[in-house]
Amino acid sequence: GPATIISYISKKRTYEGGLMFPGVRLSLDALSHHTAQLPNISLEHPRQLIGKNTEDCMRSGIVYGAPAMLDGVIDRIRETLGGAEPSIVATGPNAPVIARYCRNHVVYDKYLLMEGLYAIYQKNAK
């Protein structure tokens, strides 16, 4: 998507803050639209870490780079929390590809956003 957002939700289920940075799709679009002659590519699993052609290099950079960035941020969050082990849930159209390459345990929940919206609806319908 256009943005990757990390939200910290406390054990009391309150939003405590977060981080936001360019998402996978925005990063791919930036490479193809703002650099000389790089193609638009699809986001799919790379054949190997080190690409052998332009498209494979772009794909590996995104598919391995985004999880490495997330792992680094998760490690820093863990340090900020005094070593507490956070639960990590990924959503969004690119999450299944990216979460697979994270070294931290990441649970993919395809319906988390819809479940949250439904919970808000139910709360307000009362």
Features from the language model and the residues they span:
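A short acidic Gly-Thr/Ser loop motif
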Residues: 1-3, 24, 91-93
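Gly/Thr-rich phosphate-binding beta-strand-loop-beta motif of the actin/hexokinase/Hsp70
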Residues: 1-15, 31, 117
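Active-site-proximal catalytic alpha-helix in oxidoreductases
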Residues: 5, 19-20, 65-66
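C-terminal nuclease/phosphodiesterase catalytic domains that cleave nucleic-acid phosphodiester bonds
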Residues: 10, 22, 37-38
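A glycine- and small-aliphatic-rich helix-loop capping segment at beta-alpha/alpha-beta transitions
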Residues: 11-16, 104-108
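Short, acidic/small-residue loops that bind anionic groups at enzyme active sites
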Residues: 15-32
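ATP-binding/phosphotransfer module of carbohydrate and carboxylate kinases, centering on a glycine-rich
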Residues: 27-126
